[in-house]
Amino acid sequence: MTEKLKQGIDQLGLKVPETIQQSMLAFLAFLQKWNQAYNLTAITEIKSMITHHLLDSLSILPYLKGDKILDVGSGAGFPGIPLAFACPEKKFTLIDSKAKKTAFLLQAASRFKITNVTIIQERVGSYQPGFYFDTITCRALGSVREIMEQTNHLLRPGGQWSIMKGTYPEKELRGTDASAIVHVLNVPGLKAERHLVEVKNNKG
């Protein structure tokens, strides 16, 4: 599994220290254990988790902007946890409304000493942190328009939404901000289509 992750990270063109890669794998094992009782993810094998969770999450790393990142509907911690492992200089806030998921994330952050993450249990529409985020990201959570509307109060002017999608979201992009850019994500070992929708926040 170590080699599978290393090869995938190399194929993504990323530089992640081996010690951090080992921590990522340990996190997956921790998730697998919790998943037996709390049903946090439908993917149960470590080999598949590496592809569908770790590498999929890390594929958006080159597109992150700024130092304050919000991961909306983080669930079992994707993409937020892998990105936090890989970018210790950035501050990540992971928000989810479900108690069992935030309980897992709190335990994981403590166990693996992920000091650059903050875990919030709350609906994102009600979240008022008192500051703006530079990038808001999410995976498998609502339409592009819905995500933008629910989080508009949290993104700084000039900041960006980085929304992970499967197939090209043509219908979702109709009527959204004209500055939307769609990147094709090539996730090593993943045959399914993956895209990243980038939308700049033009509010002044």
From Swiss-Prot:
**GO molecular function terms listed in the Swiss-Prot or TrEMBL record:** rRNA (guanine-N7-)-methyltransferase activity
Keyword Transferase on this protein? Answer: yes
**Which of UniProt's keywords are assigned here?**
Cytoplasm, Methyltransferase, rRNA processing, S-adenosyl-L-methionine, Transferase
Q: Which residues cross the membrane?
A: none
Which EC main class describes this enzyme? transferase
Residue numbers binding S-adenosyl-L-methionine: 73, 78, 139
Gene Ontology cellular-component terms for this entry are: cytosol
Localization per record: Cytoplasm
Q: What is the catalytic activity of this protein?
A: guanosine(527) in 16S rRNA + S-adenosyl-L-methionine = N(7)-methylguanosine(527) in 16S rRNA + S-adenosyl-L-homocysteine
What EC number(s) does its UniProt record assign? 2.1.1.170
**Secretion signal, residue range per the UniProt entry:** none
Instruction: Specify whether tRNA processing is a keyword of the entry.
Output: no
Q: Which family does it belong to?
A: Belongs to the methyltransferase superfamily. RNA methyltransferase RsmG family.
Q: What does the UniProt record say this protein does?
A: Specifically methylates the N7 position of guanine in position 527 of 16S rRNA.
What name does the UniProt record give this protein?
Answer: Ribosomal RNA small subunit methyltransferase G
Q: Which organism is it from?
A: Coxiella burnetii (strain CbuK_Q154)
